[in-house]
Amino acid sequence: MGAVKVLPYYTVAEWEWWDGKWELIEGIPFAMSPAPLPKYQRIAGNLFQEFNLQLKKCRHCKVYLAIDWQVKEDTILEPDLLVVCGDIKRRLNFAPELTVEILSKATALKDRNNKF
């Protein structure tokens, strides 16, 4: 019988000291993909522009690209685009109004099954 593997468990406080780009989902670290492909960046840019245009007259809500969202003590995510109504200090620490993930072959499995 083989040995049981125990996955490491981390908190956002530990995550803050790491090098590189990581998401932390229920205490489990996930390395983030390298810089997105141009097609992906254009999609994100187009969505940002459209949402920004629609929210132009709203004084409380803003559109953000890829900011850190601390969901709880052991989960920090970086969605591709968010609509947030309220002030953000260092990172988002409350639920956004809208979260957008642009799926790619490299990230679809994690984004669909682990992240949201």
Regions from the language model: what does each represent?
Residues M1-F116:
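Gly/Pro/Ser/Thr-rich low-complexity, intrinsically disordered segments predominantly at protein N-termini
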